[in-house]
């Protein structure tokens, strides 16, 4: 598993080079997993993804965070739910399995249940092997913290986050 941010952002050629190095030095490894964003998959063609699959790429963990377009837009993720659907179907067609990262608390106070339902509707149309979750952490240096200070966004309570899950 390649760690460190999202290695799938690399070009197909660089990912192929890395896969060949893995095969050379660790021939007993059957698959190569890594983190990815939906925006890393978009520029890769189906043929490129199929080639990466033959080189061992599988079990890609994608930071989807949510299936709620309003939250995705507010958080400047750079993609919408339709993009998740399109790109994961492309991975399915290429034979690359994937996992999702879901982020509780991303909807803001009073919206967790609605956002969770939208996310479930999206995820139920796809084939993630694993859905992992993490809770939103707000740092004082973040843009989101500034939005809270301006009164534009309110954090979910811990109970809301648990109900959302």
Describe the residue ranges of each PLM region.
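Short linear capping/connector segments at secondary-structure termini
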Residues: 3-5, 103-106, 147-149
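Distinct, well-ordered alpha-helical segments
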Residues: 12-19, 42-52
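Surface-exposed, active-site-proximal loop segments in enzymatic domains
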Residues: 72-75, 142-153
């Amino acid at each position: 598993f390649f760690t460190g941010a999202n290695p799938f952002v690399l070009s197909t050629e660089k990912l192929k080079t890395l896969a060949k190095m893995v095969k050379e030095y660790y021939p007993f490894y059957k698959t190569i997993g890594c983190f990815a964003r939906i925006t890393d998959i978009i520029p890769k063609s189906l043929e490129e993804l199929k080639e990466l699959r033959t080189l061992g790429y599988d079990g890609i963990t994608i930071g989807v965070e949510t299936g709620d377009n309003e939250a995705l837009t507010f958080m400047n993720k750079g993609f919408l739910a339709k993009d998740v659907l399109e790109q994961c179907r492309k991975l399915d067609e290429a034979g690359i399995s994937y996992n999702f990262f879901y982020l509780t608390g991303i909807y803001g106070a009073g919206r967790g249940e609605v956002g969770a339902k939208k996310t479930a509707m999206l995820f139920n149309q796809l084939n993630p092997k694993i859905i992992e979750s993490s809770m939103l952490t707000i740092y004082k240096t973040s843009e989101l913290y500034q939005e809270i200070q301006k009164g534009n966004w309110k954090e979910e309570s811990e109970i809301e986050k648990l109900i959302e899950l």
